[in-house]
Amino acid sequence: MSKKLKAAIIGPGNIGTDLVMKMLRSEWIEPVWMVGIDPESDGLKRARRFGLKTTAEGVDGLLPHVLEDDIRIAFDATSAYVHAENSRKLNEWGVLMVDLTPAAIGRYCVLRVNIKQNVGKLEMNVNMVTCGGQATSPMVAGVSRVQPVGYGKIVAKVFSRSIGPGTRKNIEEFNRTNAGAIEKVGGGKEGNAIIVLNTAHASFMICYTIHFFIKTEPDENPIIPSVHPIIAELQNYFPGYRLKNRPLFYRNPFSIFIEFEPLADYLXNYPGNLDIMTPPALPTLDIFPDKIAIATIQLPCLEPHLP
């Protein structure tokens, strides 16, 4: 592909800012616009320092520039409550939407499990689940392919400072979307999820515990060889992703313990959840350049929108 795909980021908070910093290192995508609603927000000021165009008028402030700036992709890092309308407005202009909120109106898109299938179908809206869903759904999928998972539960423990106001407003949606990912992506019959905000002390680590109830007696002989290759593959995207200790087998349920040490692009001291949420958003479109170049898929034509 001869030129980078041009992108807009909606939401200049923790996740949106971290995403911009990762995009600036990308060879195939160019962040052009940062969209917010507060002209004095630190995120918009920071985006301008990075050389991005900005608007404090929400998505409506971006729409007049979609054609002129050839915006093909938008990454929504706002809130589940406003995502559906953001997506509708930009989809009407032929802009693909990557949803980093827990809204989950599009297909769940999870690394190592179904990312290539979703991108290959050129879905106009794909949902990146949550940081917890990206970290744990592949583990559930790894177990369910060798033993049926009747019930799966994840417990996410993150440092409070890394959770921005948008995520705090969406805790219920966060838990519901993670539970849905256990079922729709991981293959569990029933899912549950909770998030625990750690305000007691600062920690670089973000920790996930996954409890599995297996329909039959858990057998570590097929389970261990099934999940270890998944961990190795996820480390290509999350270098700090690892098993905290050996999976604990004690009849039913059994548990897998994951910890993650982040890269610290933004909120350098406490970014745990950001570095799990933002890297999957970029590989979601990583196969676009090749597929577009060989005409396997074609992006929608950008045409003036008629009300």
Swiss-Prot record:
Q: Supply the InterPro entries for this chain.
A: Acetaldehyde_dehydrogenase, Acetylaldehyde_DH_C, NAD(P)-bd_dom_sf, Semialdehyde_DH_NAD-bd
Q: Which Gene3D superfamilies match?
A: Dihydrodipicolinate Reductase, domain 2, NAD(P)-binding Rossmann-like Domain
Top-rank taxon? Bacteria
GO biological process terms on file: catabolic process
What EC number(s) does its UniProt record assign?
1.2.1.10
What is any Pfam family matched here? AcetDehyd-dimer
The catalytic site is made up of C131
Residues that coordinate or bind NAD(+): S162, I163, G164, P165, G166, T167, R168, K169, N170, N273
- Keywords, sorted A to Z: Aromatic hydrocarbons catabolism, NAD, Oxidoreductase
What is catalysed by this protein?
acetaldehyde + NAD(+) + CoA = acetyl-CoA + NADH + H(+)
Q: HAMAP family annotated for this entry?
A: Ac_ald_DH_ac (MF_01657)
Family, per entry: Belongs to the acetaldehyde dehydrogenase family.
This protein is called what? Acetaldehyde dehydrogenase 1
What organism does this protein naturally occur in?
Answer: Metapseudomonas furukawaii (Pseudomonas furukawaii)
Organism lineage string: Bacteria, Pseudomonadati, Pseudomonadota, Gammaproteobacteria, Pseudomonadales
